[in-house]
Amino acid sequence: MKSLLFFLFMLFWQTTIAQIPDHIFVFLNNKPDKAKIAEEEVKKIMDGHMTNINRLAKEGKLIAAGPFDGGGGIFIFKSSSIDQVREWLTTDPGVQANRWNVEVLPYYPQHGLVCAAQEPYQMVTYQFIRYVPYVAKDNITQQPELLKKHQDYLKVLSGSVSVITQATFGDAEGGIFVVNGEITKEVIENDPAVGQGLLVAEVKKLWIAKGAFCEK
């Protein structure tokens, strides 16, 4: 019964699950247990990381990239294949050195698209909210109802904030809600799915080139 409910949860969460994505989203998550190395080596790795970013962008593979305050960041690749993107990532010195916990996910925008920002780049900051599903015995039967309430809540919220993008990752991997401005902790926690523990909201500040989400 639990397996059936989880399957229904995945279907409800991502109605585009069977679609082939146009882009692949990568999280470079902070890695608390990464090896401690000399500052000179860190600089060498990060210089190589930036060089590799520029190369992938010039080749038309990497469409958008940006760091989070506090470390880590994101990539958005022009590809429909997770395996292909994993192969491209092997050229990154930071990935080679295991400096991040890397997640590679299909990307399904519901609001906002993905565009290659034009030079000269204007870096901007956005509030970046990631919703991570937390499936537990005490919330599994409420999932369809809570996820609908979550989507309805974001629709209402969109009327009061400047939404840059909203997207899901398919296969019950959650999604993101990115805004120009700041949503308070109280408002985020008032989301029914967050309040009931079905979704964990991770809030960060993202630096990215203006126009990366096709925003004006």
Regions found by a protein language model. Give the residues of each.
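Conserved, structured core segments of small domains
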Residues: 19-216
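Bacterial Sec-dependent N-terminal signal peptides
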Residues: 1-22
